[in-house]
Design a protein with these regions (language model features):
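Iron-sulfur-cluster electron-transfer modules
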Residues: 25, 42, 54-231
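Ferredoxin-type iron-sulfur electron-transfer modules and their immediate structural context
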Residues: 1-71
Length: 233
């Protein structure tokens, strides 16, 4: 990497300012425990310990432009292993948030945009989603004759969320979810809107979309008067 000169001015970078306090960045002991458990350590010549050192040196742009921040799975093994409790997940997510949205690799930002625009990742319309939910409920009645699918039920205890890949590609998986709620004799419902159970904006660092989609979903929970969100993912 060559000789690095650190100045107070250079150290005051967006990544350090945003991630510093929340992630306990300054408490790093450089012990390397984080790197020892990281599944992508040494990819691109990087690991969690090196990431922290680069931020300390004010090398924001090098971090932000690194492919490694996208190779990280955000599994949090490094965070759990760290004796000082440094929140590496927060650091990675913050670094991703500073990458221009159009430069986000792959399809993950497109998926996040779909969620914001259509209330789910797969761009399913309300009509198509409800039709699939009801279709699987009808099939389940062959096994459980008294099963009734509660869609938009007011005052239910549980607001059930769904991974949109299920109604899109694996609709029969929905029956497993239905069976669990039915066997538990739970008060539950699936909403016709904002039922998406995943949030790709969390992985891209798109904080605006992340907050917007969560707030809209929470608003829907309140409209139906549900007490608990059940994330089936």
């Amino acid at each position: 990497m060559g000789k690095i000169v650190v100045s107070k001015e250079k150290a005051k970078t967006p990544l350090r300012e945003i991630a510093g306090d929340a992630s306990k960045l300054d408490q790093c002991l450089t012990c390397g425990t984080c790197a020892g458990g990281c599944p992508v350590a040494d990819w691109e010549g990087m690991d969690p310990r090196k990431l922290v050192r680069m931020i300390h040196y004010g090398l924001d742009q090098e971090v932000i432009k690194s492919n490694w921040i996208w190779q990280c799975t955000n599994c949090q093994r490094c965070t759990w292993a760290c004796p000082m409790g440094i929140n590496f997940g927060a650091i990675i997510t913050t670094a991703r948030s500073l990458v221009p949205r159009e430069e986000t690799p792959g399809e993950i930002q497109k998926t996040a945009n779909n969620h914001r625009e259509t209330m789910n990742n797969m761009r399913l319309t309300v009509e198509d989603a409800v039709e699939t939910f009801e279709w699987m409920a009808e099939d389940l009645k062959e096994e459980i004759p008294d099963f009734e699918l509660p869609i938009d039920k007011q005052g239910a205890e549980f607001f059930c969320t769904i991974n949109s890949k299920q109604p899109q590609y694996y609709p029969m998986d929905l029956m497993s979810i239905y069976k669990i709620f039915h066997a538990a004799k739970a008060s539950w419902t699936i909403s016709s809107r904002w039922w998406e159970g995943t949030n790709y904006a969390m992985f891209t660092g798109d904080f605006d979309t992340w907050e917007y989609t969560l707030r809209e979903q929470a608003k829907r929970v309140e409209e139906l008067g549900c007490k608990t969100m059940a994330y089936t993912e």
